């Protein structure tokens, strides 16, 4: 995992997840830490809408699960095996789509369909299908490739910041 190959937004999400795990005294950055940080951000709101995921409800589920993680006093925090594997899966997907930078969306989708309990619960609760979610992400991108560190900021920018001038 190379931080220089991550979008600026993903770098921020990762740092926020590390800080969240530390503040919650988790022994490692786990799927719940990554998902909580992603759900607190607005970068994927368009994807959540497309796949029918209620961000508020999902955030509640993740926070409840986070309370069940054992506490640790370690100051040297690493990524859990599930999160590492999710980053690898996301990188593979990004490579298949000729992308230079790893995005929050590709990591989110890999996290969503990893083997963690919370991921399985989210998939079950919101009746999510892996192929449909990846297809929704490709549609959201509308053919855009993530080839600069801030490419992610431009996806759905018109919808987010634009207004009808007519």
How would you name each of these model-derived features?
Residues 1-166:
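Histone-fold recognition with a strong bias for associated Lys/Arg-rich disordered tails
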